[in-house]
Amino acid sequence: LGIRVTDKRQAPPRLHDLPSLQKLCASRFGWPAAKTLEVAQALYDGEGKKIITYPRAEVRYLPENLASDVPRIVAGLQVGQSFKSIPVPSSPVIRKGSRGSFHDKGLEGASHHAVIPNVNTIDILREVWPRLSIDEKKLFDVIARGYLAAVMPDFRYRQTIATLDASGFVFKATGRQPIDPGWRAAFPKWRPDEKGDDAQWLPTMKSGETTQLLNPTIEDKETRPPLRYNEGTLIEAMQNAWRFVDDESLRDRLKEAKGIGTPATRAEIIVGLKRQGFLAIQAKNVVPTETGLALYGVLRTADPALVDPGVTAQLECLLDDVVVGKQDMVGAID
């Protein structure tokens, strides 16, 4: 065996905005995008609730001055049994800047910050909790754990790359051994999406060791087409319309654009397309109907720009420039 070992660390995931909540709830709970918004709205302004901040956010940062609320929110959450065992340090980790959670510049042009527990009602969470529905508890759990993870230490792990020469054929395995769970301790039952060999756990190995192959097999495999959209991943695609732009210079420019629709309208756009018979749900996947494909063909023939998501992204980017003063209204119209 040839072994290369490197100690690494991983910062916590970003806080949630509405699109990330819709994507997560679609994959974990099977919720339509509209349901996630409905449940979030109830947690925000439902009678006797009001335990999260404005849910229709499309940014995953907080203002830097909200760092002072961290101790109070953490203490309020840990009163309840659901979050009591999460080992948030007595001095929470405040990460600022683009790689952290508190980033003023990341909020430029945004009306609302990331979705987090409401500091103004955190002290009465124990009283409110019994009144919540099962779905409301599920969604609040997602939001609360995301917030707690954001102020916990990095996940530290040892990355091992093992190479094995077997009769002239070199095999490689990459994996991890945990050193300190850090923020991952906030998620005992699930993990953020991870794919590939880097995510697997390997036992302790030493360079120079000899090993024995047990029941080796050769498998024939084929590449698979991209997965179909569910409502959560479709919301994400609508938010990141820049990915559908071929021009590399435009792609970078459009990454900060709002994409197709807004957090408040994307779920309703999907609902409307289903209601009109252009989209349907098959085994939790969103698929175009024959009517939808026929309409797409007509519009694309008439003018490809009508069905180009990149064009919409460019228009949204132009409107954003008007909002922040980078472009005047007359120039934008022209």
Residue positions per predicted region:
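Core catalytic DNA strand-manipulation module of type IA topoisomerases
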Residues: L1-D334
